[in-house]
């Protein structure tokens, strides 16, 4: 009797774990990559970026990673950050490269990258692909660095993978940082 109860409990535990993995994969398959940020040098309060009407995004520098970051990733991240900042509707102008006069410039360099790719990820094992960058938010009028942050995009889905998803995750992280310090919407 005790053995049957133990087997039933173990079977329930194994089955429940699998259901949780499937549920998580379904969720991340819908939501895509996630982004997070950590401020190394704070931008200031919740209205610190309100006075800037425009923002420009430089292509992030892959050279610190000594060839580990695919060259195409710099352009994908730049485009993803621009798209996410356009979504915020907080700036009258969002551009690749230099912003309009009196705007903000977001520039960065890649500092960590793991493409993942393990087939074991589909069943809950292995490392999730991630891409991290150190960014600076610069006042172009004074060329002063207003803040520094670490931004990371992580792909937790076994279905939606690849460099485009990682770039989108980094874009979400930058968007979150800007939304934390900008209250006005154009």
Task: Label every model-predicted segment.
Residues 1-19:
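Sec-dependent bacterial lipoprotein signal peptides
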Residues 56, 147-148:
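Structural recognition of the beta-strand scaffold that forms the well-ordered cores
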Residues 68-79, 132, 157-169:
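Soluble non-cytosolic domains of exported or imported proteins
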Residues 59-62, 151-155:
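Short, histidine-centered active-site or binding-site loop motifs used for metal coordination
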Residues 64, 77-92, 114, 170, ...:
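Sec/Tat-exported extracytoplasmic proteins
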Residues 21-31, 88, 92-145, 152, ...:
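Surface-exposed short loop/turn segments
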Residues 153, 159-186:
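Compositionally biased, intrinsically disordered linkers/stalks adjacent to structured regions
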Residues 18-79, 178-186:
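A structural "domain/chain start" motif
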